[in-house]
From Swiss-Prot:
<dbReference type="InterPro" id="IPR046378">
    <property type="entry name" value="DAXX_histone-bd"/>
</dbReference>
<dbReference type="GO" id="GO:0045944">
    <property type="term" value="P:positive regulation of transcription by RNA polymerase II"/>
</dbReference>
<dbReference type="GO" id="GO:0003713">
    <property type="term" value="F:transcription coactivator activity"/>
</dbReference>
<dbReference type="GO" id="GO:0005730">
    <property type="term" value="C:nucleolus"/>
</dbReference>
<dbReference type="GO" id="GO:0042393">
    <property type="term" value="F:histone binding"/>
</dbReference>
<dbReference type="GO" id="GO:0045892">
    <property type="term" value="P:negative regulation of DNA-templated transcription"/>
</dbReference>
<dbReference type="GO" id="GO:0000281">
    <property type="term" value="P:mitotic cytokinesis"/>
</dbReference>
<dbReference type="GO" id="GO:2001235">
    <property type="term" value="P:positive regulation of apoptotic signaling pathway"/>
</dbReference>
<feature type="coiled-coil region">
    <location>
        <begin position="445"/>
        <end position="488"/>
    </location>
</feature>
<keyword id="KW-0805">Transcription regulation</keyword>
<dbReference type="GO" id="GO:0030521">
    <property type="term" value="P:androgen receptor signaling pathway"/>
</dbReference>
<dbReference type="Pfam" id="PF03344">
    <property type="entry name" value="Daxx"/>
</dbReference>
<keyword id="KW-0137">Centromere</keyword>
<dbReference type="GO" id="GO:0072738">
    <property type="term" value="P:cellular response to diamide"/>
</dbReference>
<feature type="modified residue" description="Phosphoserine">
    <location>
        <position position="543"/>
    </location>
</feature>
<feature type="region of interest" description="Interaction with histone H3.3">
    <location>
        <begin position="189"/>
        <end position="423"/>
    </location>
</feature>
<feature type="region of interest" description="Necessary for interaction with USP7">
    <location>
        <begin position="353"/>
        <end position="576"/>
    </location>
</feature>
Length: 739
């Protein structure tokens, strides 16, 4: 009998819950619960009369719950109207969900409890009204009447079997009552299990709260039975219990989390592939993150099933794009779910304005230190595995390169030697020849492996780019040095216009003359071309080569009419205008510049010509320069007449004695060196230990490269630069014009 009493209490559980609720009035006692033993046995065996009595009592309690639920629902809608005035579609949406819900659920104590809780929390926290609206919508959708219509096709059969004017409402009521009766019998049969599972859920929730409030020591991190792991195990059990409870109650297990939302995918142009990928990422069960292989297999299956006829390379591209898009979408969904569900019951009462770290500086400092420590450790882990990945990729690249070099070996020393000895296009041509031959041999050997060929070509292109960068850097350094010398020449040109020159030491001249052969040895081609214009210096009795002798005689013949007809100023202006196109050729290859300027020193000046005591030109002077012209010999004769003892004093020229002042009009200077004043301007060196030095610069335009060596020797004799170009620009000293 004790068991019968307990069973009766479980059957009338709705009445007990109704009595516990504050809303409805006290219900009349059920006569079946106080009846004698035969009545109990009849109810237990399932006779018809006790069922009718129980049905009448249940119908009365349902009517009371239904009225109370309608009242609470109307109050909630009024609250939603005031709080969601910006979104007027919320209230009609809730009305629609209520109409679609099951009548049994609308008249149940569960719905009454949900409405009471949602209404109380909404009044307490109006800012979270949409959260509670979402909770109510989830419950109403879970108890929607759509599922019950599919399970009861008897209504359609009865309507077909009836006459032309059948009564539609009574059959629907009958089917509803039958469904509710069968549902009640089924739920009553498992009510004991439901009650037991609910008790277990309450026990698990209390234990999880206790473990969350417990402090976790660092020594417990390696403990397999730490409080954190216990909490995780209890949460997994609680999820399984919740799923089982939803099955017994015949309701949906969806809780409205972001992670439960379905992700639509429209990333590709093929609907079949989109459907397959969408089915993959929305697969029920655990939230598993698909990898690239899963996405590729899904794309291949869709292409094979629907005969898309796509090549494998295009399938791989589709899979790569889809994997990136799917990964971003899944990551965003997980991040939002973490934000919405982060924390525990300890953070339920948290408000942004009552953060304890705002009032406690020690706590705020500790939180900042912990955050910094966490970010540093995270960066260390990421950098560690990134370096491991880089090392692995580098090792694979080296193995592949060794394998390629083993199939087609090529010597690597000739390109390096050519890059060191020759600069410019000639050097680059010598470097590109081995690489192109290497590419041809690799194409012949590895025609079947497309990936290896692509990698090899990319590596060759990188090597060529590095070699080109080195060559351009050398050219830029030389151009910068020449520009600095040009700036020094321009400064000295202003001093020459005033009639002053700075003294220079002979050691600088000899040092630069000794460095000249090193510049001349850069390219063999430059040496060969330089040999065409050079005249070796020899004693007076030595025999000269016929070409050099002809060049000297022709140069003298060309120079005499120029000197006799035109003034030095007009000659210089014409030659400067001819040299102007050379400004556009600054960025021309080094090969052309070196071939056209065989005797240029490091600082941009020409070969130093020194005058000895007896007025003759020393034998080492014309090693790399053209022979002196007739005018130059006349100047040295005049200089020789003014020598006094050990001092070298240059007397004024005939033009300055006559009062003629030579001035250079401001013209754009050549790119390699600035043109100084004319050679017959007054120059004076006060130091007795210095020699008279004049430097000539040959800067013909590219159009004059194919002319005869006589014209080049003529230009070398006429173009004069300042003495200051032979020394450092910082060491220029402007002397006074006092006699």
């Amino acid at each position: 009998m004790a068991t019968d009493d307990s069973i009766i209490v479980l059957d009338d559980d709705d009445e007990d819950e109704a009595a516990a609720q504050p809303g409805p009035s006290n219900l009349p006692p059920n006569p079946a619960s106080t009846g004698p033993g035969p009545g109990l046995s009849q109810q237990a065996t399932g006779l018809s009369e006790p069922r009718v009595d129980g049905g009448s009592s249940n119908s009365g309690s349902r009517k009371c719950y239904k009225l109370d639920n309608e009242k609470l629902f109307e109050e909630f809608l009024e609250l939603c109207k005031t709080e969601t005035s910006d979104h007027p579609e919320v209230v009609p949406f809730l009305h629609k969900l209520q109409q679609r819900a099951q009548s049994v659920f609308l008249a149940s104590a569960e719905f009454c409890n949900i409405l009471s809780r949602v209404l109380a929390r909404s009044r307490k926290r109006p800012a979270k009204i949409y959260v509670y609206i979402n909770e109510l919508c989830t419950v109403l959708k879970a108890h929607s009447i759509k599922k019950k219509l599919n399970l009861a096709p008897a209504a359609s059969t009865t309507s077909e079997a009836s006459g032309p004017n059948p009564p539609t409402e009574p059959p629907s009521d009958l089917t509803n009552t039958e469904n509710t009766a069968s549902e009640a019998s089924r739920t009553r049969g498992s009510r004991r299990q439901i009650q037991r599972l609910e008790q277990l859920l309450a026990l698990y929730v209390a234990e999880i709260r206790r473990l969350q409030e417990k402090e976790l020591d660092l020594s417990e991190l390696d403990d397999p039975d730490s409080s954190y792991l216990q909490e995780a195990r209890l949460k997994r059990k609680l999820i399984r219990l919740f799923g089982r409870l939803c099955e017994l109650k015949d309701c949906s297990s969806l809780t409205g989390r972001v992670i439960e939302q379905r992700i639509p995918y429209r990333g590709t142009r093929y609907p079949e592939v989109n459907r397959r990928i969408e089915r993959l990422i929305n697969k029920p069960g655990l939230d598993t993150f698909p990898d690239y292989g899963d996405v590729l297999r899904a794309v291949e299956k869709a292409a094979t099933r629907h005969s898309l006829g796509l090549p494998r390379q295009q399938l791989q591209l589709l899979a790569q794009d889809a994997f990136r898009d799917v990964g971003v979408r899944l990551q965003e969904r997980r991040h939002l779910d973490l934000i919405y569900n982060f924390g525990c019951h300890l953070t339920d009462d948290y408000r942004p304005g009552v953060d304890p770290a705002l009032s406690d500086p020690t706590l705020a400092r500790r939180l900042r230190e912990n955050r910094t420590l966490a970010m540093n450790r995270l960066d260390e882990v990421i950098s560690k595995y990134a370096m491991m990945q880089d090392k692995t990729e580098e090792g694979e690249r080296q193995k592949r390169r060794a394998r390629l070099l083993g199939t087609a070996p090529q010597p690597s020393d000739p390109p390096q030697a050519s890059s060191e000895s020759g600069e410019g296009p000639s050097g680059m041509a010598s470097q590109e020849c081995p690489t192109t031959s290497k590419a041809e041999t690799d194409d012949d050997d590895d025609d079947d492996d497309d990936d290896d060929e692509d990698n090899e070509e990319s590596e060759e292109e990188e090597e060529e780019e590095e070699e080109e960068k080195e060559a351009t850097e050398d050219e830029d350094e030389d151009l910068e040095q020449l520009q600095e010398d040009q700036g020094g020449d321009e400064e000295e040109e202003g001093g020459d216009n005033e009639g002053n020159e700075s003294p220079t030491s002979p050691s600088d001249f000899f040092h630069r003359r000794n460095s000249e052969p090193a510049e001349g040895l850069r390219t063999p081609e430059g040496q060969q071309k330089r040999g065409l214009t050079e005249t070796p210096a020899s004693p007076p009795g030595a025999s000269l080569d016929p070409p050099s002798t002809d060049a000297e005689s022709s140069g003298e013949q060309l120079l005499e009419p120029l000197l006799g007809d035109e003034s030095p100023v007009s000659q210089l202006a014409e030659l400067e205008m001819e040299a102007l196109p050379e400004e556009r050729d600054i960025s021309s290859p080094r090969k052309k510049s070196e071939d056209s300027l065989p005797t240029i020193l490091e600082n941009g000046a020409a070969v130093v010509t020194s005058t000895s005591v007896n007025g003759r030109v020393s034998s080492h002077t014309w090693r790399d320069a053209s022979p002196p012209s007739k005018r130059f010999r006349k100047e040295k004769k005049q200089l020789g007449s003014g020598l006094l003892g050990n001092s070298y004093i240059k007397e004024p020229m005939a033009q300055q004695d006559s009062g003629q002042n030579t001035s250079v009009q401001p013209m754009p200077s050549p790119p390699l060196a600035s043109v100084a004043s004319v050679a017959d301007s007054s120059t004076r060196v006060d130091s007795p230990s210095h020699e008279l030095v004049t430097s000539s610069l040959c800067s013909p335009s590219p159009s004059l490269l194919l002319q005869t060596p006589q014209a080049q020797s003529l230009r070398q004799c006429i173009y004069k630069t300042s003495v200051a170009t032979q020394c450092d620009p910082e060491e220029i000293i402007v002397l006074s014009d006092s006699d």
